[in-house]
From Swiss-Prot:
Lineage: Bacteria, Bacillati, Bacillota, Bacilli, Bacillales
Protein name: Urease accessory protein UreD
Stated family: Belongs to the UreD family.
Highest taxon of source: Bacteria
GO terms of molecular function: nickel cation binding
DNA repair in keyword set: no
Keyword terms of this UniProt record: Chaperone, Cytoplasm, Nickel insertion
Length: 273
């Protein structure tokens, strides 16, 4: 495998009711802020930055995060990630997350924007314990096109595997390939252009909680939203929308609901703009 275009490793632990870094390493195009503490729960907030401006042909990014026992961390990006044209190749990102006993990890980056002739692959592996918590979102949107076409990218290929006590509990593979089939058709994006996934794994998730979440959404007229439970205590939400703002509104509503009803915490503002 070629040398990474950017590397980011974060290792945190709980110390005196506060999450603190043990080791943080970043190299080349990937950078990260110092931990920021925005709430009263000792959670460490990190903002990932890409100094390269966007992903290009042959780029390879590696992000590895370890959340120790009882630690809490929230990780997001500074802004949307842009993937530009990748002729005869693709950009690759690999994510490996390790969540310890009674630990909580929230990974909610801004959307991935796919421009004309872009090809992108993402591989995500997450290793959890029975009483750890995961809140994860992933979203993809088309980039601006001079002729107003929605899908001018080559493909978006994202594979997520979640392991609970070393047992595979979630296998989620999304492949959007507008060069081979129309994404507007029923059963794929159905005339929508923006796609989002929100995954929650937490021991407090029940069928009643999922039912309550379904009825809590507001301003959903221009979207399609589906919720399914996982084989472990958790659920997956799919969102189809026409714009980023509507999709992120649902992400925020889901995030706030999970914080309040699963973690029994308030959701603190983490405004970036």
């Amino acid at each position: 495998m070629k040398s990474p275009t950017g590397v980011l490793n974060i290792d945190v632990m709980e110390k005196r009711d506060k999450t603190v870094p043990i080791k943080v390493y970043h190299k080349d195009a990937l950078k990260v802020t110092q931990p920021i503490y925005l709430d009263k729960y000792g959670r460490a907030y990190y903002y990932i930055m890409n100094s390269g401006g966007g992903y290009l042909k042959g780029d390879f990014y590696s992000i590895n995060i370890n959340v120790g026992k009882d630690a809490k961390t929230y990780i997001t990006s500074q802004s949307a990630t842009k993937v530009y044209k990748t002729p005869n190749s693709y950009a690759l990102q690999e994510l490996n997350f390790y969540i310890g006993q009674n630990a909580a990890m929230e990974y909610l980056p801004d959307p991935l924007i796919m421009y004309k002739d872009a090809a992108y692959k993402q591989k995500t592996n997450i290793y959890m314990q029975n009483n750890s918590t995961l809140i994860l979102c992933d979203s993809v949107t088309p980039g601006w096109s001079p002729n107003m076409e929605k899908f001018t990218y080559q493909y978006f290929d994202s594979l997520t595997k979640i392991y609970m006590e070393n047992k595979l509990v979630v296998y989620d593979h999304l492949l959007l390939n507008p060069f081979k089939e129309s994404l507007d058709q029923m059963g794929i994006l159905n005339q929508y252009s923006h796609y989002g996934t929100f995954i929650v794994i937490n021991e407090n998730v029940t069928n009643d909680l999922i039912a309550a979440l379904k009825t809590s959404f507001s301003n959903t007229n221009n979207m399609k939203i589906g919720i399914a439970s996982t084989t472990c205590k958790g659920f997956v939400i799919r969102i189809l929308s026409h714009n980023t703002e509507d999709m992120e509104s649902i992400f925020f509503q889901c995030h706030r609901f999970v914080r309040e009803n699963c973690l029994h915490e308030e959701l603190t503002s983490y405004r970036k703009y």
